[in-house]
Amino acid sequence: MNQTLLSEFGNPAERVERALDALRHGRGVLVLDDEDRENEGDMIFSAENMTVEQMALTIRHGSGIVCLCLTEERRQQLELPMMVEKNSSHYQTAFTVTIEAAEGVTTGVSAADRLTTIRAAIADNAKPSDLNRPGHVFPLRAQPGGVLTRGGHTEATVDLMTLAGLKPSGVLCELTNDDGSMAHAPEVIAFAKQHDMPVLTIEDLVAYRVAAERKAS
């Protein structure tokens, strides 16, 4: 990632700290992956703090595929089978079956309905019967070890929530341009400025975690 583009958001460690602070205060962040990977920016919000307005923003400016990033423990708690037995996707994106809240939604498509589904899935006492399958929210299972195991947006989302002291569940959606094409670094940065959202990279987060673990040892 071209660090010059991101320099106005601080150095790598500062970018992570600003993102964590934003998440603690209920704001969203934008996460870029490597230019030689997907080279995309995702809008990411804390699942427990996300508002209907933020969900509407996500649907309006995103790909429409609103994903809920979960730990393996939560996936098992909800008894969500993986979408396929053999994952042949290029980046091994770990989708489970899609979900809908069993109560409190109509068609499940609206911003409010999708948020109701997410809140049902992350509730402390959530059980499998709280969710219908299929639905309009796409759960993703994060790899244990986070970005140190897999450098994906799913793992970055769960890592950010954990580091921020929040529930280890987050909502992500790929940012798109008005013409439907995927947003890359310049467009992501412009969107971030317009909506007062911090920007960081998965590379930043990897370095931050490595430094923290080295310091702890």
UniProtKB/Swiss-Prot annotation:
Protein's gene: ribB
Key word Magnesium present: yes
Keyword Disulfide bond in annotation: no
GO-annotated cellular components: cytosol
Record PANTHER family: 3,4-DIHYDROXY-2-BUTANONE 4-PHOSPHATE SYNTHASE (PTHR21327:SF38), GTP CYCLOHYDROLASE II-RELATED (PTHR21327)
EC nos: 4.1.99.12
Any one Gene Ontology BP term: riboflavin biosynthetic process
Protein name per its UniProtKB record: 3,4-dihydroxy-2-butanone 4-phosphate synthase
Subunit structure: Homodimer.
Cofactor: how and how many bound: Binds 2 divalent metal cations per subunit. Magnesium or manganese.
Classification lineage: Bacteria, Pseudomonadati, Pseudomonadota, Gammaproteobacteria, Enterobacterales
Record-listed Mg(2+) 1 binding positions: E38
Species per Swiss-Prot/TrEMBL record: Pectobacterium carotovorum subsp. carotovorum (strain PC1)
Family indicated by similarity: Belongs to the DHBP synthase family.
General function of this protein: Catalyzes the conversion of D-ribulose 5-phosphate to formate and 3,4-dihydroxy-2-butanone 4-phosphate.
One MF term in the entry's GO annotations: magnesium ion binding
InterPro entries reported for this sequence: DHBP_synth_RibB-like_a/b_dom, DHBP_synthase_RibB
